[in-house]
Amino acid sequence: MVDTKNPGDKTLSVGPSKTLTLKPRVEQGTVRQSFSHGRTKQVVVEKRGKRRIGGDAPAAEPVAASEPTVARAPRIPVRPAPPAASRANSGVVLRTLTEDERTARASALAEAKIRAEEERRIAEAEAARRNSKEGIEQAEREAAEARRKAEEERHRQEEEAKRKAELEAKRRFGESETKAAPAKTTTTTTRAAPPARPAAVAADGSDEEEAPRLVRRPGGGPARPVVAPKPAAKPAPAKQRGRLTLVTALSADDVRERSIASFRRRTQRLKGHASNEPKEKLIREVIVPEAITIQELANRMAERAVDVIRMLMKQGAMHKITDVIDADTAQLIAEELGHTVKRVAASDVEEGLFDADDDSTVVEPRSPVVTVMGHVDHGKTSLLDAVRHANVVSGEAGGITQHIGAYQVTSPDGKKITFIDTPGHAAFTAMRARGAKVTDIVVLVVAADDGVMPQTVEAINHAKAAKVPMIIAINKIDKPDAKPERVRTELLQHEVQVESMGGQVIDVEVSAKNKTNLDKLLEMISLQADLLDLKTNASRPAEGTVIEAKLDRGRGPVATVLVQRGTLRVGDIIVAGAEMGRVRALISDQGETVDEAGPSVPVEVLGFNGPPEAGDRLAVVENEARARQVTSYRAHQKRENAAASSSGMRGSLEQMMSQLKTAGRKDFPLVIKADVQGSLEAILGSLEKLGTEEVAARILHAGVGGISESDVTLAEGFNAAIIGFSVRANKEAAAAAKRNGIEIRYYNIIYDLVDDVKKAMSGLLAPTLRETMLGNAEILEVFNISKVGKVAGCRVTDGNVERGANVRLIRENVVVHEGKLSTLKRFKDEVKEVQSGQECGMAFESYHDMRVGDVIECYRVETIQRSL
């Protein structure tokens, strides 16, 4: 291949050499713009020429908007390559290309082909994009038209709302004339659809867009096409850009109006003026419990807590929002703020638990409940054993009843009668009171040979307080010294008049030993029950009273319950005092397991979480949630009462601190465990009565059940004794007590327990010191002996003087020394005693200030042990 080499030939050229200049493309003008209300404004309008790249092209002819033109794929003109032949008239000698030049030219040609193929693919893709762009623009035009219509509708609605708001503002604030411009009727201007891009045809028949120009590569390689820049995004309207054009400035349709944001701000201001008007205060019903925090009270009233605190400060009380105030103060604050108050109490959880009215159409007769009361050893339990054909007395320790018991018997006429046996000992006053409260009839047993005794009088008072009828059973008429008439006469002193003496109280002479007149006694009880007309609803939830409670090692907490209303069934959820549970088993007085217990039936109930207190009322509730509410309230009340009593004790101790220090009161610490709640209650009452100002029993812990290791640990900490009443200690507790030296005492009879504790407490009492006068002696002369010291020469004037006795040295009727007589001599001999009228020598222990004329008084001190 040959080529010409012409020094003047420039193969790499973009075009003819031209000078680069910047021509002004901006034309300016001034336009006067008019606004509403006669306002005008001078506006500078600039007109910019269109910048063209790649030379001047002929102007494009616009195409009608109704006839959109579909863009055609641009044609890429191919410029013919320059001929490789040498110029004929160049006159230059040709030479052969070197191997490197041929290789470079071959590489350049290959690269040019690759670039040409890439440019062809790019051009085809650009043509396809332009074809799809027309369809997209059509869809955009339709969407713009829909948006325009929606915007016009929104403008119309906002104008209407603005007009109504202005009218409302004028009416509310009484404006004389409107400040806002009258509502302008929005005219719907039909805007022409934006015209399609005109398809300008070039002079040579090519499309509007200029074909990519080819740029030659250095070295004579194939030309590389220059890709035209992509069209910029569609500019926003001039109004949105915030500047005016000549066309928009001269147009009358684009008069500036209030913006939407301005209208919204005005609406907000109007709403703010309306919100500043005084609001009508809402009166609320405020529920006020017994205690409430200030924050909670403010929340319930929908008031600020600061306002509540301010009102409290006016009353002279400084509080925080977390402080608790009482119900009275909360009610005063709520009423002062204009609210109504509804007082509630925590005890409202117990409403409807007891004493619900029964339907008179479903009531049916029930068995009477009879309580046997009287003095100790008058034969109450023996009489009940004779009626039941049982032998309960033999099972009682000491032959006295120390537990309250409930039994059910059948009378000769087939009716059932429930008996409650109460102890007669003075310590069981609370048991007798409980028996009188749950009973329908009281049988007062009086021994014919003993008459009316203190516990008999107490039983009469219990029956009168409970307002229940009495039947007098004069027992032990089989004894030779029985005097029933004396019993009737003594009862008159306590306002009990029997039928035989013109009264209304039934009396029956019986003998429990010989079973005399027992049928007559049961007949009188049935007659009295018929007069009372006892009826109840057996189908309602059960209510009853806990007669006795204990902690059984094998069965857990066990409560003896007398069902008074309704029917108690296995599985019922029950509440008694601060304890709750589900009935696991019901055991009758005969020891049989039953499924239910009706009215007036005594049963043992198993299933409590803990042993309830004797005397607590039992009720069946609907679910465990209600049971937990009731028991938690009662437990809280119990803790508060205990805290109040302890704080009261602390206050009294602080007030009497000086007296306690001088008196030196001593405590006798005890840990007491009993078998049942009633016995424990009786023991605590008896020990409390033993206390004096000098010594008292301090009960560290009292409970029901056996003695455990924790009881021993507690007793060890306070060096206390442990008392077990009808209970025993387990192996661990016994071993711990033996190891730590803790004394455990067991008792079965209550008065033995009380007597032993009384003796032990008496040992803590300070003994009484009693002085016995022996005689007087007068000092005649004082001698000073080197080994002994001063010795007084005395004459005994009265009684006698003994060596080692207590003496007082009296000078001018004032006691100057008290001590002991260390030396007593007659002449030179030590003697034990000197009689009246004799002279002797005396010396005191550690005292030598003796003078002539002093009187020595000699006496003996005796120590006498005291007892409670």
From Swiss-Prot:
GO cellular component, one term: cytosol
Protein name: Translation initiation factor IF-2
Localisation per UniProt entry: Cytoplasm
Native source species: Nitrobacter hamburgensis (strain DSM 10229 / NCIMB 13809 / X14)
Domain tr-type G intervals: 365-535
Location, primary (coarse class): cytoplasm
HAMAP family to which the protein is assigned, alphabetical: IF_2_B
Gene3D superfamilies reported in the protein's UniProt record: P-loop containing nucleotide triphosphate hydrolases, Translation factors, Translation initiation factor IF- 2, domain 3
Region spans: G5: 511-513
UniProt binding sites for GTP: 374-381, 421-425, 475-478
Region described as Disordered: 1-20, 28-92, 125-240
Region annotated G3, chain positions: 421-424
Feature: compositional bias, Low complexity: 57-76, 179-203, 223-239
Stretches the record annotates as G2: 399-403
GO MF annotation: an example: GTP binding
Function summary: One of the essential components for the initiation of protein synthesis. Protects formylmethionyl-tRNA from spontaneous hydrolysis and promotes its binding to the 30S ribosomal subunits. Also involved in the hydrolysis of GTP during the formation of the 70S ribosomal complex.
Family the UniProt entry places it in: Belongs to the TRAFAC class translation factor GTPase superfamily. Classic translation factor GTPase family. IF-2 subfamily.
Residue span of region G4: 475-478
PANTHER family: TR-TYPE G DOMAIN-CONTAINING PROTEIN (PTHR43381:SF5), TRANSLATION INITIATION FACTOR IF-2-RELATED (PTHR43381)
Region (G1): 374-381
